[in-house]
Amino acid sequence: MKILFVTFSIALLGALAVFSQTGNSPLAGFWQGAVEKDGRIWRVNLTIEKTGASFKALADFPDADGYGREFSVGQTGETFRLERPQPSGVPIVFEGAPRGDVFKGSWSGFGQTATFNLKRAAPPEKFYREREVAFKNGDVTLAGTLIAPLKGGKFGAVVITHGATPNERAGYRSWALHFARKGIAALVYDKRGAGRSTGETRAASMEDLARDAVAGVEFLKLQPEIESRRIGVAGHSQGGWIAPLASVMSKSVAFVIASAASGVSPDRQSIYHRANLMREDGFSEETIKLASDLRARLYATGRMLLENDPRAARERRRISAELEKYKDAPWLDAAALPPNLDNDNPPRGALELLFFEPAPMWEKMRVPVLLVWGDKDKVVPVEEGKTIILKALKKGANPDVTVKVFPNVDHGVTIVGTDKTWDFPRVDLNYYDAIVNWTVSKLKNQKI
């Protein structure tokens, strides 16, 4: 009888603990399972907290390498609707009614419908710590998060830079977590002009953005948990220009990771990318050439503006007149050309960024560098860019260069299917494993 009473007491305490953790709501807690469509599984973890009458829902999608994605929560009767907006305008939605330890229902996203089935589970053991930080580059204040392994002392570290457009730190959180799992700290921050960072994105030159990354390195050098001589800079896409430029600017950068980097200038890369988007939309090569030529002429006026060439205004008016002729053309929106250029001169920093030539920078690099691409990248010209970068590194006699190209991987590190059947977005996690393992090997080298 005594044993029975003790067993009952332990069970009651466990039930009370679960009741407390779930905030007296059938939805709150940690849920683990998957979305399923036509036999294809897409793993999902949900962490849902209730405070008062409101919920906070965070979703992890391990197959897409997406972590901590915030969802809004609505309730109608016993049915809950979790929703997250998407750039396409069509949100990702979970809708269902939890029953005890099971939460299942309908799912929609990416233009598809499916079902989801989740079970209540114990939350995974946390392997990292994080804290909000801020650092300065001149008049610009950059807000970020320092993510470090939960256990241990001095860590090597990586400053993670951004792609194009005003990016916030959340988009790089999963990359930071990959590093933390292997004992490396990472600083992610809101790009200038985004999130809680001050400054203006559009007015920034490539040098401005690289100096922001260097400021992050200098900040990390002062942190007690960071080994000051073992700090590198990593970047994806536009970050593949920023990271190596930061290493040329500062001897404090111990190594560089350039993912999906373009070996050609941003203006040429933009023309290449837009042409590929138009091909995907089914436009003819003749139409694509017309749009590409217009874009090249538009960029040429930008160079004129940068050089204070008085012919710039006249040429921009001429291009505006041509664009007016095509205002009803079905390809104009796909070409992403402005309908009118009057009074729309870009700031000088944006023009300097547009015509940034990367080869001289690579020639000056002296630190270990990892170059990683996916061979199905349609945003940057991989083979052309790889040739340019490696030639420049050879000219500069950089002794420590590693190159990896992953098959069937696109610019977003998403696996490109070899057949035509639909699948959930899946990231090639081997891509990130290669990056982290290379970093671990370099940090073991006493010379950096």
Model-derived features: where do they sit?
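Central antiparallel beta-sheet cores of small beta-barrel/beta-sandwich binding domains
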Residues: 21-99, 106-108, 112, 142-145, ...
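Short beta-strand element of the alpha/beta-hydrolase
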Residues: 154-163
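Short beta-strand/loop motif that positions the catalytic acidic residue
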Residues: 365, 371-373, 377
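The serine-hydrolase catalytic nucleophile loop
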Residues: 165-177, 191
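Alpha/beta-hydrolase active-site loop
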Residues: 204-224
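Accessory cap/linker subdomain of secreted extracellular hydrolases
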Residues: 257-364, 397
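N-terminal cap/lid segment of alpha/beta-hydrolase-fold proteins
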Residues: 119-152
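Conserved alpha/beta-hydrolase
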Residues: 179-196
